[in-house]
UniProtKB/Swiss-Prot annotation:
Region annotated Alpha C-terminal domain (alpha-CTD), chain positions: 247-329
InterPro entries registered for this protein in UniProt: DNA-dir_RNA_pol_insert (IPR011262), DNA-dir_RNA_pol_RpoA/D/Rpb3 (IPR011263), DNA-dir_RpoA (IPR011773), RBP11-like (IPR036603), RNAP_asu_C (IPR011260), RNApol_insert_sf (IPR036643)
Highest taxon of source: Bacteria
Record organism: Cytophaga hutchinsonii (strain ATCC 33406 / DSM 1761 / CIP 103989 / NBRC 15051 / NCIMB 9469 / D465)
Reactions mediated catalytically: RNA(n) + a ribonucleoside 5'-triphosphate = RNA(n+1) + diphosphate
GO biological process, one term: DNA-templated transcription
Quaternary assembly: Homodimer. The RNAP catalytic core consists of 2 alpha, 1 beta, 1 beta' and 1 omega subunit. When a sigma factor is associated with the core the holoenzyme is formed, which can initiate transcription.
Disulfide pattern: none
Protein name: DNA-directed RNA polymerase subunit alpha
Length: 329
């Protein structure tokens, strides 16, 4: 009995692309494969590509994030929020993970000023305001940069040995700002039930959308190769190995138990969730979008904010969190 062949695209069509935006088409695909491929690529693109981000800061005379700095209008918490948004592109092979920035006699500190103190990185959003400085004051700050994937909370960016005055911060490494996909019907000869997948990728400029798509596809290919006949093996699992604590399980459990009060939510979004008795990230992740739209004073702006939060944390709405035993201490 012969094996029926699948209808597959001969190539990927790049409709348009620049350093920040790419639009790609895959056609024709068998029915159902548009969503299957589109969703897999979207999740990998958002969570698994590498990038650079600030993971910690050190300011002379500052011991914690709730401090204020003489001659600087913003407090340290606001400065950290702004630094989390700075996007970097590595342009040199120099291994530089510390940047000391010194702002002297200028009214503001913008992201572009960081480039004056490093030759290893390009700042992709130079006009981003970090803080306002009294023109008669000086402002010095040491930035720690690291390479990583996805998102890491400040707790996981703490150095192995405690450093006096060092403040770890949340790091958003992913170079992908957004990914959208849609599936349309397409014709092959007389049949009109084949599918066309349209994939739209928005990056921060540190990676070209075409390279991002290739990188995500290669990650999937490497994982799927594990299921090929040549590499698939079955080994008996020892009882003691079954009792080994799963680090990923513990990480996810800790993340889901994070209090919403500890996250950088807007006042409106936080109050809407608080009124609905939603207190933790895990409780938020179990909700469906339709559930949230029923909340009092909850609108599209709050929904967009929470959708981005869920993406940044590599979660999804409608999650089944029962297996993480969040009710247990």
């Amino acid at each position: 009995m012969s094996i029926l062949s699948f209808q597959m695209p001969e190539k990927v069509v790049m409709e348009k692309a620049d350093d920040f935006h790419g639009l790609f088409e895959f056609k024709p695909l068998e029915k159902g494969y548009g969503v299957t491929i589109g969703n897999a690529l979207r999740r990998i693109l958002l969570s698994s590509l590498e990038g650079y981000a600030i993971t910690g800061i050190k300011v002379p005379g500052v011991l914690h994030e709730f401090s204020t700095i003489p001659g600087v209008r913003e407090d340290v918490t606001e400065i950290i929020l702004n630094l989390k948004q700075v996007r970097f592109k590595k342009i040199s092979d120099v291994n530089e993970n510390k940047i000391v920035v010194s702002i002297k006699k200028q009214a503001s500190f913008k992201a572009g000023d960081i480039a004056k103190f490093t030759s290893a990185y390009q700042i992709l959003n130079p006009e981003l305001l970090i803080c306002n400085v009294d023109s008669n004051s000086n402002f010095d700050i040491e930035l720690t940069l690291e390479k990583g994937r996805g998102y890491l909370p400040a707790e996981e960016n703490k150095p192995a040995e405690q450093i006096f005055g060092y403040i770890p911060i949340d790091a958003i490494f992913t170079p992908i700002k957004n990914v959208k996909y849609s599936v349309e019907n397409t014709r092959v000869e007389q049949r009109t039930d084949y599918e066309k997948l349209i994939l739209e990728i928005l990056t921060d400029g540190s990676i070209h959308p075409e390279d991002a798509l290739k990188g995500a596809a290669n990650i999937l290919i490497k994982h799927f190769m594990l299921f090929s006949d040549q590499t698939m093996t079955f080994e008996a699992v020892k009882a003691e190995e079954e009792e080994t604590v799963d680090e990923e399980f513990l990480h996810m459990r800790k993340l889901l138990k994070t209090s919403l009060a500890d996250l950088d939510l807007s006042v409106r979004a936080y109050n809407c969730l608080k009124a609905a008795d939603i207190k933790t990230l895990g409780e938020l992740a179990t909700l469906d979008i339709s559930d949230m739209m029923k909340f009092r004073n909850f609108g599209k702006k709050s929904l967009n904010e929470l959708e981005q939060l869920i993406i940044d944390k590599n979660l999804s709405f409608g999650m089944d969190t029962a297996k993480y035993k969040l009710d247990e201490d």
